[in-house]
Amino acid sequence: MSNKKADSKPQAKYPVNLLDTPFPMRGDLPKREPQWVKEWEARGIYEKIRAASQGRPKFILHDGPPYANGDIHLGHAVNKILKDIVVKSRNMAGFDAPYVPGWDCHGMPIEIQIEKQFGKSLPAAEVMSKARAYATEQIEKQKVGFKRLGVLGDWANPYKTMNFVNEAEEIRALGKIIEKGYVYRGLKPVNWCFDCGSALAEAEVEYKDRTDPTIDVMFAFAEPEKTAHAFGLPALPRAEGGIVIWTTTPWTIPANQALNLHPEIIYALVDTERGLLIIAEERVEACMTDFKLTGRVVATAPGVKLANLRFHHPLASAHPGYKRTAPVYLGDYVTTDTGTGVVHSSPAYGIEDFMSCKAHGMTDSDFINPVMGDGRYIESLPLFGGLSIWDANPKIVDALNAAGSLLRSEKYTHSYMHCWRHKTPIIYRATSQWFAGMDVTPQDGGKTLRETALEGVDATAFYPSWGKQRLFSMIANRPDWTLSRQRQWGVPMAFFVHKETGELHPRTLELLEEVAKRVEQSGIEAWQSLDPRELIGDDANLYEKNRDTLDVWFDSGTTHWHVLRGSHKDQLQFPADLYLEGSDQHRGWFHSSLLTASMIDGRAPYKGLLTHGFTVDGEGRKMSKSLGNGIDPHEVANRLGAEIIRLWIASTDYSGELAISEEILKRVTEGYRRIRNTLRFLLANLSDFDFAQHAVPVDEWLEIDRYAVAFSQQLQTELLGHYEKYEFHPVVAKLQTYCSEDLGGFYLDVLKDRLYTSAADSRARRSAQTALYHLTHGLLRVLAPFLSFTAEEAWKVFQPASDTIFTETYYAYPEVAGSAALIEKWALLRDVRGSVTKALEEARTANRIGSSLQAEVAVHASGARYDALTSLGDDLKFVLITSAATVVKVDDEAQESVDVAASKYQKCERCWHYREDVGAHAEHPTLCGRCFSNLFENGEIRSAA
């Protein structure tokens, strides 16, 4: 280490111990950080951490894989840096905490990119080959971005869902859940995107406002006598009229097959200008106003009395193709919040409609399903064949009006389902898909998937705790999981299905293993090119390859199987200690992982779930291109340093939204400078200190040094408690207070006189340096998880022989005898010092003194304060940073005060104290007695400070 004098003017004659350090005041982070990234990689620092951690208890944070598409954004930075802080803090806490990053590689976004670049007519094999190449290129690009943020991990050996071994293990995982009896095939309404041409998972659906036509439509009486009887009438007063429904999806009217009423709601038969209308009694007044009609209630009946009545389709008079009737089915899901209290049911396009019609005896072959996968009606649909459903909406409204069935039509803005990729509206559409049944009893007769998953939620620790109820209610209320997708770039559901019955081949489990072996060698392309005869021989005449692929949420949702216990089983283990993602993953990765592990293992794949919020600007607005308020982590790293991003994330309560703006970054940068200046002071004042040669035993330290170490040890205990619970913002807040107030504002301030003016090798100075040595060890380690670049830079100056700070564990401070009493005593002294500082400031403002060293103070104190102050003896002046200090005993707190007077003595040229003995030695007329002693004799004796 360097031992240069920082200022040669006064020191030339009477030197002070003002030392320098190669740790610069300016961080110059954008320039230095990339050099550290290169050095960490070149020197294999991650591997050294792993070697140092060998044999310790494992802590596994399992990386939720980002999608291998596009540049990293601020949300990625938040996620990866939080993970890095967790992993580094767990390693330093004495765990073996590896970090294996991963990527999600299959699925629609990459297929879309390939279509954009090469068109839609590529053969499947070529789509796969180009998709693999594209994903690889994107991963490499993102990898550079993540490393630049200071994230340490096994970047040379990440997991990728498209690696052959992972693809093969996914097929084996599918085999496991089939064997256990969770998988079935059925016709069911699923989230369907016309642009994807595929079913969507719940997590791929987002809600946005959309304006649609809302219509009230009458289904005319088909059984007037039965209807009259249901209402307790001998006959209907008139023939015209019917039952009225309200819907926001006119396009579903052509597929109507039933009407739903609540069994307990009271329905009214209302005589109006448009005939007799059946409406829920409590909606009559609102509906009459909406329809611009006047009405008189003729009779009422509960819904249960109207069950099985039939009504004509509202387009029956418009085209013979609609000459059918709709029965009334009872359903508890019907409400009277809006509309008419009557729900029209198109079972192919709604979950509740589907369940209701199934419960009333309809079979799959009974369902009318005229909407094709691209969103157009089949050509044979009367009146609207070939039209897209959205284009058909106004035409259907017109046709209903012409048929005399329309009572009202207006525009309605509501929150509606959209595809998260295409941002286009989606629908429920009944298709034949493979499902994992939430309420299916498995083969072993055990608990259902829903029951097992809910138990898994209960057994998991949540950070923050509100996540538990959120995930619990999602699992409790979710439908069966649609496992199948109609895509090319995905892991195949590698079944052979009977050409006529759709049944699985009887040897399915065995065949899945055969396919998995081939995929392990050649990737999913092996299934694409497989001739069925190779595996099933002549059965190929009866069975064909299933063309569906697995939902990509199954890819990432089974990483606990194909990564933790598969491709990276030597480094990782099951279950993981922690999954850490954004709060949207309660319905995404947390959710799918829980379901797959519940099916395969009967438990959750994680012990803990940590969720963080999303980034917003300084005014709390979401970041968007239209607002122009987005912040690019690359730009910030290149301008201010990745360390500033890391400090911003660590200092923010991530359980809510994370606000960022230039003003916020400016404040973070100021906080960073304070920490850096503290480190620079510590390192400079240790630059001539060799612990082996100069360390002073604890029991010989000055009292304030023992206090500083005891206080720092107590603080570290608090900080490690926060780290343990993943509470990083209190860690940062307490460390910033520690650096600016406990060290900079007190201990280091008091220490300057002793460090600079005591004899270089005196016990007093070496005691201070020994304490600073321990403080620096402790401080750098607790900073390292979040201020990784700065801690490493300081560590290389502090411990140049050590490879890296990241192989260290949290510091074991030396034990200080009576530490609790010492901390309590010095809390009192610091309180008094605060009062003295205030009095000095008032004297300075009144021009009675210049600096605090020009002052002599008398502290009037009582009780414990008096005892604490007098125990310091003559060292009290050093604690108060005055040239003289006396203590006057008073009876009680009310009499306590501070008197400040300007010293009448001369100022020492070297230590700047005003002392009576300045010039006592004629040959040194500007030097005080203690400086003379420190320079030319045995040096002053201090005991406390």
Swiss-Prot record:
Recorded GO CC terms: cytosol
Localization in the cell: Cytoplasm
GO biological process, one term: isoleucyl-tRNA aminoacylation
Main location as per UniProt: cytoplasm
Xref: Gene3D superfamilies: 1.10.730.20, HUPs, Valyl/Leucyl/Isoleucyl-tRNA synthetase, editing domain
Annotated L-isoleucyl-5'-AMP binding sites: E581
Enzyme Commission number(s): 6.1.1.5
Residues the record lists as binding Zn(2+): C908, C911, C928, C931
Motif 'HIGH' region mapped to chain: 66-76
Cofactor binding, note field: Binds 1 zinc ion per subunit.
Pfam families in UniProt: Anticodon_1, tRNA-synt_1, zf-FPG_IleRS
Residue positions of motif 'KMSKS' region: 622-626
Catalytic reactions on record: tRNA(Ile) + L-isoleucine + ATP = L-isoleucyl-tRNA(Ile) + AMP + diphosphate
Keyword entries, A-Z: Aminoacyl-tRNA synthetase, ATP-binding, Cytoplasm, Ligase, Metal-binding, Nucleotide-binding, Protein biosynthesis, Zinc
Needed co-factor(s): Zn(2+)
Positions annotated to bind ATP: K625
Chain segments annotated as transmembrane: none
Domain notes: IleRS has two distinct active sites: one for aminoacylation and one for editing. The misactivated valine is translocated from the active site to the editing site, which sterically excludes the correctly activated isoleucine. The single editing site contains two valyl binding pockets, one specific for each substrate (Val-AMP or Val-tRNA(Ile)).
Sequence similarity: Belongs to the class-I aminoacyl-tRNA synthetase family. IleS type 1 subfamily.
NCBIfam families: ileS (TIGR00392)
Subunit description: Monomer.
Protein name (database record): Isoleucine--tRNA ligase
Organism annotation: Burkholderia cenocepacia (strain HI2424)
